Amino acid sequence: AENSPIPTSCIDHNRTFFPEMNVVSVTDIERLAKSFPDLENLWDRIPHWIIKADIGRLLYIYFHGNFYFDVDCRIRKKIPLDSERCMILFTEMILKDVNRLGPRECKNPENVLRVANYAFGTNVIKHPFLHEVIMECIKRLAFLIESGPSKLEQLDILWVCGPDVITTVYHRSKNLYPDLILLDMSYLSHLCHGSWRD
Protein backbone atom coordinates (compact mmCIF):
# COMPACT_ATOMS: atom_id res chain seq x y z
CA ALA A 1 0.00 0.00 0.00
CA GLU A 2 0.91 3.65 -0.30
CA ASN A 3 3.43 4.71 2.35
CA SER A 4 4.51 8.16 1.16
CA PRO A 5 3.16 11.25 2.92
CA ILE A 6 0.27 12.91 1.11
CA PRO A 7 1.36 16.22 -0.50
CA THR A 8 -1.25 18.34 1.23
CA SER A 9 -0.04 21.53 -0.48
CA CYS A 10 -1.53 20.31 -3.80
CA ILE A 11 -4.77 19.29 -2.13
CA ASP A 12 -5.08 22.63 -0.33
CA HIS A 13 -4.30 24.54 -3.54
CA ASN A 14 -6.81 22.51 -5.58
CA ARG A 15 -9.57 23.28 -3.08
CA THR A 16 -9.62 26.80 -4.50
CA PHE A 17 -10.94 25.26 -7.74
CA PHE A 18 -12.92 22.34 -6.30
CA PRO A 19 -13.86 23.15 -2.68
CA GLU A 20 -15.74 19.91 -2.07
CA MET A 21 -13.33 16.98 -2.07
CA ASN A 22 -13.61 13.55 -0.58
CA VAL A 23 -11.33 10.63 0.07
CA VAL A 24 -12.53 7.28 -1.19
CA SER A 25 -11.84 4.13 0.83
CA VAL A 26 -10.86 0.68 -0.39
CA THR A 27 -14.26 -0.58 0.79
CA ASP A 28 -16.01 1.97 -1.44
CA ILE A 29 -14.07 0.75 -4.47
CA GLU A 30 -14.54 -2.97 -3.74
CA ARG A 31 -18.29 -2.42 -3.61
CA LEU A 32 -18.20 -0.71 -7.03
CA ALA A 33 -16.00 -3.44 -8.54
CA LYS A 34 -18.82 -5.92 -7.92
CA SER A 35 -20.81 -4.14 -10.65
CA PHE A 36 -18.44 -5.63 -13.23
CA PRO A 37 -18.55 -9.44 -12.78
CA ASP A 38 -15.31 -10.06 -14.70
CA LEU A 39 -13.53 -7.51 -12.51
CA GLU A 40 -15.05 -8.93 -9.33
CA ASN A 41 -13.69 -12.37 -10.30
CA LEU A 42 -10.21 -10.92 -10.81
CA TRP A 43 -10.18 -8.50 -7.87
CA ASP A 44 -8.49 -10.70 -5.26
CA ARG A 45 -5.91 -11.81 -7.83
CA ILE A 46 -4.79 -8.28 -8.71
CA PRO A 47 -1.04 -8.41 -8.06
CA HIS A 48 -0.31 -4.79 -7.06
CA TRP A 49 -2.24 -2.24 -4.98
CA ILE A 50 -1.72 0.57 -7.52
CA ILE A 51 -3.68 -1.41 -10.12
CA LYS A 52 -6.64 -1.47 -7.73
CA ALA A 53 -6.19 2.25 -7.09
CA ASP A 54 -6.05 3.07 -10.81
CA ILE A 55 -9.14 1.00 -11.60
CA GLY A 56 -10.81 2.38 -8.49
CA ARG A 57 -10.53 5.98 -9.65
CA LEU A 58 -12.21 5.06 -12.93
CA LEU A 59 -14.99 3.15 -11.16
CA TYR A 60 -15.67 5.94 -8.69
CA ILE A 61 -15.99 8.67 -11.31
CA TYR A 62 -17.98 6.35 -13.59
CA PHE A 63 -20.60 5.74 -10.89
CA HIS A 64 -20.59 9.17 -9.22
CA GLY A 65 -19.40 11.70 -11.80
CA ASN A 66 -17.20 14.64 -10.74
CA PHE A 67 -13.42 14.94 -11.07
CA TYR A 68 -10.49 12.81 -10.05
CA PHE A 69 -7.03 14.28 -9.42
CA ASP A 70 -3.97 12.46 -8.07
CA VAL A 71 -2.88 13.99 -4.77
CA ASP A 72 0.32 15.19 -6.46
CA CYS A 73 -1.56 16.90 -9.30
CA ARG A 74 -1.78 20.70 -9.14
CA ILE A 75 -4.48 22.62 -10.99
CA ARG A 76 -2.98 25.66 -12.75
CA LYS A 77 -6.11 27.39 -14.03
CA LYS A 78 -9.89 27.16 -14.07
CA ILE A 79 -11.18 24.11 -15.90
CA PRO A 80 -13.98 25.00 -18.34
CA LEU A 81 -17.24 23.39 -17.27
CA ASP A 82 -19.57 25.14 -19.70
CA SER A 83 -21.54 22.18 -20.96
CA GLU A 84 -24.46 20.27 -19.47
CA ARG A 85 -22.79 17.06 -20.64
CA CYS A 86 -19.02 16.66 -20.86
CA MET A 87 -16.20 14.21 -20.30
CA ILE A 88 -12.96 16.11 -19.69
CA LEU A 89 -9.52 14.62 -20.22
CA PHE A 90 -6.09 16.20 -19.95
CA THR A 91 -3.04 15.87 -22.16
CA GLU A 92 -0.26 14.18 -20.23
CA MET A 93 2.49 14.77 -22.80
CA ILE A 94 3.33 14.67 -26.48
CA LEU A 95 6.18 12.32 -27.33
CA LYS A 96 8.59 12.76 -30.23
CA ASP A 97 7.71 9.28 -31.48
CA VAL A 98 5.96 6.11 -30.32
CA ASN A 99 9.23 4.19 -30.01
CA ARG A 100 9.53 5.70 -26.52
CA LEU A 101 6.52 3.67 -25.37
CA GLY A 102 6.67 0.39 -23.48
CA PRO A 103 6.72 -2.97 -25.29
CA ARG A 104 2.96 -3.62 -24.98
CA GLU A 105 1.77 -0.03 -25.41
CA CYS A 106 -0.12 0.85 -28.57
CA LYS A 107 2.29 2.19 -31.22
CA ASN A 108 -0.24 3.84 -33.54
CA PRO A 109 1.28 7.16 -34.72
CA GLU A 110 -1.42 9.28 -33.05
CA ASN A 111 -0.45 7.78 -29.69
CA VAL A 112 2.41 10.26 -29.39
CA LEU A 113 -0.33 12.36 -27.77
CA ARG A 114 -0.66 10.77 -24.33
CA VAL A 115 -3.80 11.25 -22.24
CA ALA A 116 -3.34 11.58 -18.48
CA ASN A 117 -4.87 9.07 -16.11
CA TYR A 118 -3.91 11.22 -13.09
CA ALA A 119 -6.79 13.63 -13.77
CA PHE A 120 -10.15 13.40 -15.55
CA GLY A 121 -13.77 14.18 -14.89
CA THR A 122 -17.33 14.20 -16.09
CA ASN A 123 -20.70 15.57 -15.15
CA VAL A 124 -22.36 12.44 -16.57
CA ILE A 125 -23.04 9.44 -14.36
CA LYS A 126 -21.94 6.22 -16.14
CA HIS A 127 -20.34 8.05 -19.04
CA PRO A 128 -19.85 5.49 -21.86
CA PHE A 129 -16.25 6.61 -22.48
CA LEU A 130 -15.32 5.65 -18.91
CA HIS A 131 -17.16 2.36 -19.35
CA GLU A 132 -15.02 1.62 -22.39
CA VAL A 133 -11.84 2.51 -20.46
CA ILE A 134 -12.85 0.25 -17.54
CA MET A 135 -13.59 -2.63 -19.92
CA GLU A 136 -10.18 -2.18 -21.57
CA CYS A 137 -8.53 -2.29 -18.13
CA ILE A 138 -10.40 -5.50 -17.28
CA LYS A 139 -9.37 -7.09 -20.59
CA ARG A 140 -5.71 -6.19 -20.03
CA LEU A 141 -5.83 -7.25 -16.39
CA ALA A 142 -7.27 -10.66 -17.31
CA PHE A 143 -4.53 -11.12 -19.92
CA LEU A 144 -1.80 -10.16 -17.45
CA ILE A 145 -3.11 -12.43 -14.69
CA GLU A 146 -3.61 -15.37 -17.06
CA SER A 147 -0.12 -14.96 -18.55
CA GLY A 148 1.21 -15.07 -14.97
CA PRO A 149 4.49 -13.16 -15.16
CA SER A 150 6.92 -14.36 -12.50
CA LYS A 151 7.67 -10.76 -11.58
CA LEU A 152 5.38 -7.83 -12.25
CA GLU A 153 7.35 -5.04 -13.95
CA GLN A 154 6.50 -1.34 -13.85
CA LEU A 155 5.75 -1.48 -17.58
CA ASP A 156 3.16 -4.22 -16.92
CA ILE A 157 1.39 -2.03 -14.38
CA LEU A 158 1.44 1.00 -16.67
CA TRP A 159 0.03 -1.07 -19.52
CA VAL A 160 -2.80 -2.64 -17.49
CA CYS A 161 -4.33 0.50 -16.03
CA GLY A 162 -1.98 3.42 -16.61
CA PRO A 163 -2.09 6.17 -19.21
CA ASP A 164 -1.86 3.77 -22.16
CA VAL A 165 -5.39 2.51 -21.48
CA ILE A 166 -7.08 5.91 -21.52
CA THR A 167 -4.81 7.04 -24.39
CA THR A 168 -5.65 3.97 -26.50
CA VAL A 169 -9.39 4.30 -25.90
CA TYR A 170 -9.28 8.05 -26.59
CA HIS A 171 -7.61 7.63 -29.99
CA ARG A 172 -9.69 4.58 -30.92
CA SER A 173 -13.09 6.00 -29.96
CA LYS A 174 -12.94 9.79 -29.59
CA ASN A 175 -15.29 10.27 -32.55
CA LEU A 176 -17.99 8.26 -30.77
CA TYR A 177 -18.26 10.77 -27.92
CA PRO A 178 -19.15 14.31 -29.05
CA ASP A 179 -18.97 15.54 -25.44
CA LEU A 180 -15.35 14.42 -25.02
CA ILE A 181 -13.01 17.35 -24.36
CA LEU A 182 -9.22 17.01 -24.29
CA LEU A 183 -7.53 19.95 -22.58
CA ASP A 184 -3.90 20.86 -23.19
CA MET A 185 -1.02 20.59 -20.71
CA SER A 186 -1.42 24.16 -19.44
CA TYR A 187 -4.27 23.23 -17.06
CA LEU A 188 -2.36 20.94 -14.71
CA SER A 189 1.06 20.09 -13.43
CA HIS A 190 1.82 16.62 -12.15
CA LEU A 191 4.61 16.25 -9.61
CA CYS A 192 5.02 12.60 -10.64
CA HIS A 193 5.82 11.30 -7.17
CA GLY A 194 5.17 7.77 -8.47
CA SER A 195 5.53 6.38 -4.95
CA TRP A 196 4.12 3.03 -6.12
CA ARG A 197 7.28 2.30 -8.09
CA ASP A 198 9.83 -0.07 -6.57
Regions found by a protein language model. Give the residues of each.
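Small-residue hinge/turn detector
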Residues: 55-66
